[in-house]
Regions:
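Nucleotidyltransferase catalytic core that binds NTPs
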Residues: 3-4, 9-179
Length: 179
């Protein structure tokens, strides 16, 4: 796991919240284990699972109905007090765009510091996302890999267009984005 953070010096932050977005088509043990590991490793207060209603990079016929995925997620996290599910993208009309979701969560929780959790496969395509460069101004990233995946040097996965704006912070073992 690699953390990509913003150069944030907010005073009084009391909540570090993970936002685990995705299709969850369907939710499985790998998602839950990843969320649990990230929760502990990064000392988060909670992890919010946000299933996308209309994923921009997937066709409708390959995705289970959003309400069914929401129900499956809700059942899967039952009993885990630090996991919650948000229906933000399910109730919002149109395509599900991460930047809009993060902005809405920040409005709802102005004292929180958000960490968007995603897999390396998704992060490698982030420069195809809607307003992807703005995401680096809005949230921190935690990029996860699947067990057995080859080691990737973190500086090689940062999109080339914004690579110069990242600096390695050895103390925290993370890349920090400075706008």
């Amino acid at each position: 796991m690699v953390r990509f953070g913003r150069n944030d010096n907010k005073e009084g932050i009391i909540l570090n919240i993970g936002v685990y977005g995705g299709t969850f088509n369907p939710i499985h043990f790998g998602h839950l284990r990843t969320a649990e590991e990230v929760f502990h490793k990064f000392k988060l207060k909670q992890v919010i699972f946000v299933p996308s209603a209309q994923p921009p990079h997937k066709s409708d016929e390959e995705v289970i109905d959003p309400l069914h995925r929401l129900k499956m997620l809700t059942l899967a996290i039952t009993g885990n007090e630090h996991f919650t599910v948000s229906d933000l993208e399910i109730i919002r009309p149109g395509k599900s765009y991460t930047v809009e979701t993060i902005r809405e969560l920040k409005k709802q929780n102005p004292d929180a510091n958000f960490y968007f959790i995603l897999g390396l496969d998704a992060f490698l395509e982030i420069n195809t996302w809607y307003h992807w460069q703005e995401l680096f101004l809005e949230t921190n990233f935690i990029v996860t890999t699947r067990p057995g995946s080859p080691q990737v040097r973190p500086n090689r996965i940062i999109p080339q267009e914004i690579r110069p704006q990242f600096k390695w912070k050895a103390k925290n073992k993370e890349f920090v984005y400075s706008s």
